[in-house]
A protein has these predicted regions:
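Active-site His/acidic residue clusters
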Residues: 87-94, 187-204, 227-231, 235-242
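Long hydrophobic segments that form regular secondary structure
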Residues: 209-230
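N-terminal catalytic scaffold of extracellular/periplasmic and nuclease hydrolases
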Residues: 1-178, 184-186, 190, 207-212
Length: 242
């Protein structure tokens, strides 16, 4: 897609994708919501749409690859992101909405309807200072266990990576158990890491102990999803932390 105008993938030759020109002065390129939707569903759509048909019809929800693999093949599914879990890219694989900024609606669908087997991402209200990326009621449901997840969250002074990996070891995905990790720093995202200027001896200093690294979050997710003999699907996103 370029701008707000779409072409069905089935009608667009692969080679043509390299010659498409900007056709909307206000939208020189697609946004991450429609880009992720194209990857997750094989369907091009309007900028800002999360797995939803162009034009925003009432019945426009698009089935994602994660949903198809779960329903047709029995796969377990997970999303890992260094930005808030209800942001466009992770959300496009496990939710549906006409507006990427409807964070509460998107988070509610992920937590209560799609219910991926593993969700790890940013958006914790304590680190952001308010409820922006999920509602207080959904946060409380996660915290109390009512949402059906083993919940690991950003906690001052606690090593988030260790806590996440420890929790993952207790999950039996074949028994329907699920893991949710909610972290974040400034802006709701995981912390930036500081790379050392030491040629020949590379190292990275994490921004905080409370947030897991992407490696830790991924390893925790894989330790859960890999239990499924039918297979698994994982969407993994790295942004704004390196």
């Amino acid at each position: 897609m370029v701008g707000y105008f779409t072409l069905p993938m089935s009608e667009t030759l692969i080679r043509d994708a390299y010659f498409l020109k900007q056709i909307d002065e206000e939208e020189p390129a697609t946004d991450s919501a429609s880009a992720a939707t194209a990857i997750a569903t094989g369907q091009k759509t309007d900028a800002g749409n999360i797995a939803w048909l162009t034009g925003d019809p009432a019945d426009g929800a698009l089935t994602t690859i994660a949903e198809t693999l779960r329903s047709d093949q029995g796969f377990s599914i997970g999303v890992v992101s260094t930005v808030p879990f209800s942001h466009a890219t992770p959300a496009a694989f496990v939710s549906h909405n006409v507006n990427r900024n409807n964070y509460f609606e998107i988070a509610n669908e992920i937590i209560n309807t799609t219910q991926p087997d593993v969700v790890i991402g940013g958006g914790h209200p304590d680190t952001y200072g308010r409820f922006r990326y999920l509602s207080e009621s959904d946060y409380n449901a996660l915290n109390s266990g009512d949402a059906g997840y083993t919940f690991v969250e950003w906690t001052a002074g606690v090593d988030g990576g260790d806590a996440l990996l420890t929790a993952a070891e207790t999950i039996d995905v074949t028994a329907g158990e699920k893991l949710f990790g909610l972290f974040g720093g400034e802006g709701g995202n995981f912390d930036f890491h500081q790379a050392s200027d030491t040629p020949g001896n590379p190292s990275v200093t994490p921004g905080s102990v409370e947030n897991p690294t992407l490696t830790e979050a991924t390893n925790a997710t894989l330790s859960v999803l890999n239990q499924d003999p039918d297979g698994f699907f994982l969407s993994r996103r790295l942004t704004w932390m390196t």
